[in-house]
Amino acid sequence: VSKLIKGHKSTVQKVAWHPNGLVLATACTDFKCRVVSAVVEEVDTNPDPRPFGTVKPFGEAYHQFSCGGWVTAVAWSPSGSILAYAGQDSTIHFVHFDHSGAVSEQRVRYALLPVSSLVFLSDKAVVGGGHDMNPLVFTANSSGQWSFLRRLDEKSTGPAKAEGAVSSMSAARAMFQAKTTRGQASSGGAGKDLWTQHANAIVDIEGMGRAGDPTCSKLSTCGLDGRLVVWEIPTLDIDMQALGL
């Protein structure tokens, strides 16, 4: 069965299926995030209305949320009770749905470049990747309030390399990489490569947990630098309890 969902006024950049498989969230460049019904009568004979109160016909919107810029990413929590969507204005919005259908929304602004992909590790933690070239971690406290926690990829504090140990070939390669990946005229010093795993914007981030698991402790990111990086969260120096893992 193939059907068209109408109502978007510009490009749809990302979509995310609700865990129940009956609701779709969309991220659109018309500054809107929409939650729409994807119930197909010929297929879904007994649709579960939770947590949206009632079951609506295919294509009808349950909710429409506004953002201060293009909506660049969207994701559902494992339980399906939390929706996260990111804006080009360096904000992430967290929408909480309770079983009665009531909705509450929180906006988190962060002083970094915007993200273009989101994934939940648990109902208490979400990771975003984008133009900062470094995955960003956001967590919820015991009262359900979200905030920015840290970058996932933190700079190593190991011993510095000697400046004179870098060959002229390595210096030339570093300068070329700086020009092509970041638009810089120089690399900021011979041999001073980026310390992050990615050298350009992250375009997608995916959880690598088992289907149906309430948590995910492993994820992958891919970027415009041509790299695919696998992250084992327990091996990083990060508070696992804060992540709900």
Walk through the language-model features, giving the residues of each.
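Blade-level signature of beta-propeller repeat domains, shared across WD40, Kelch, NHL, RCC1
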Residues: 206-241
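Conserved loop/turn motif of beta-propeller repeat scaffolds
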Residues: 21, 80, 123-124, 211-216
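Per-blade loop-tip surfaces of WD-repeat and WD-like beta-propellers in eukaryotic adaptors/scaffolds
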Residues: 1-9, 32-64, 68, 88-105, ...
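Conserved GH/AH loop at the N-terminal boundary of individual WD40 repeats
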Residues: 7-8, 67-68, 111, 152-155, ...
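Conserved strand-to-loop turn within each blade of WD40 beta-propeller repeats
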Residues: 27-30, 86-89, 129-131, 222-225
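Canonical WD40 repeat/beta-propeller blade segments in eukaryotic WD-repeat proteins
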Residues: 10-17, 62-76, 112-120, 199-210
